[in-house]
């Protein structure tokens, strides 16, 4: 068993609670040892909604086990009396799975209406966050969806929006605005903000829209098999994907309109999608052709995250900003084949599929790209390497759960992505100018008067002060790095910090090739000329 340190995916409970916490009249009872209610603090801190998470813990205690008792029936009774939800989801923990308790039987002894209880007996050792969330939502839809008459006007369901989703509420608002401009109403958004009654109304919509590959596809496939509902899948990340998403949606809506003898929907003028109703809906097409952005065509980018945002971001960087993609990966092995098929022709090397952050950190250190798009973990790794990084996928920090409007999808999302790419790559110049012309009292670097030596970006070993008067002081290096003289270190400091580690590494490799054992100022100049710096 690996240490649960810096994992990309949460536990099965995390996925279950993302669904139940999204809904209005659903409550989760987690049968687990005391202390596993940490999940409520996670939602309270990150979600930034006025509602308290709908989750209770049925505590498993050693003394109860010794007496052959269980607190689950009593907990279910208390939840029923206090909250009176339409549905209670009972979830096992690793501890109860090891004990092999029969949660179905224990739930029946609670006296609560069995129709109100769903024992989601997922294996917490094998199933993680995304699979658990997708499975539970699909099960709730299967339980609830009932045959319905289609709405008179064109309508859609938006499936897959869940609590703690990446920029969830802003993306939802962005899609709402697009649909309103098209003249399409929203029948149900689920699971976010939906009730069990709302789930029963799902079949009355004309089309099911599923932006996220990880969440909602199982429910959409069930609704297609059971009720013949068409599916529009894919995330509209970027200007061209958004236009294609709109065209595909209109095509599906108009097919149904023809069958019903209703008027067809036309594509509105693009200005109608803009905030002011007068200008272009996105500034990305012209911004990408400015002299400032054209310099990005030579920049190298690496992308890592969940399936949806990895695919969307690679295509956005390559197709709309013209950046060079040096590699991409995902931590969701279940969706790796889909990612490979979507990114065919975009990647110069095989897709990286791993849930070990150390492997991704090593990849970034080896490649030293000009931009990394990843999760909060890549942000930590890049901070140590002085590599620009923007977060584009869960897991995230609290700053990615914003109160303000900050979409990733749609035309407005394309503008925000372009801004984030630009500022992530460019803001480092300010620090470089301060380093180059003087810090004016701002301590961005360590004390430059200290005699030190960096090795592959790490701090130098403590050394004795060198003999005064020597023109070039050589200090021993740590690890695999080569010794650098003081004058070479001073020359290196004039290199922008965000490529400094890369220059150090390339210089040392060059020195080894020509048989040098110490990096002096002369060796540094030769390396610069040879490597085109």
Curated annotation (Swiss-Prot):
GO MF term list: 4 iron, 4 sulfur cluster binding; ATP binding; metal ion binding; oxidoreductase activity, acting on iron-sulfur proteins as donors; oxidoreductase activity, acting on the CH-CH group of donors, iron-sulfur protein as acceptor
Catalytic-site annotation from UniProt: 292 (proton donor)
Cofactor(s) this protein requires: [4Fe-4S] cluster
Recorded superkingdom: Bacteria
GO biological process, one term: photosynthesis, dark reaction
Catalytic activity reported: chlorophyllide a + oxidized 2[4Fe-4S]-[ferredoxin] + 2 ADP + 2 phosphate = protochlorophyllide a + reduced 2[4Fe-4S]-[ferredoxin] + 2 ATP + 2 H2O
Enzyme class: oxidoreductase
Pathway: Porphyrin-containing compound metabolism; bacteriochlorophyll biosynthesis (light-independent)
Cofactor remark: Binds 1 [4Fe-4S] cluster per heterodimer. The cluster is bound at the heterodimer interface by residues from both subunits.
The protein's Enzyme Commission number: 1.3.7.7
SUPFAM superfamilies according to UniProt: Helical backbone' metal receptor
Keyword Nucleotide-binding: yes
Function: Component of the dark-operative protochlorophyllide reductase (DPOR) that uses Mg-ATP and reduced ferredoxin to reduce ring D of protochlorophyllide (Pchlide) to form chlorophyllide a (Chlide). This reaction is light-independent. The NB-protein (BchN-BchB) is the catalytic component of the complex.
The family this protein is said to belong to: Belongs to the ChlB/BchB/BchZ family.
Subunit field text: Protochlorophyllide reductase is composed of three subunits; BchL, BchN and BchB. Forms a heterotetramer of two BchB and two BchN subunits.
Protein name (database record): Light-independent protochlorophyllide reductase subunit B
Organism: Prosthecochloris aestuarii (strain DSM 271 / SK 413)
Designated gene of the protein: bchB
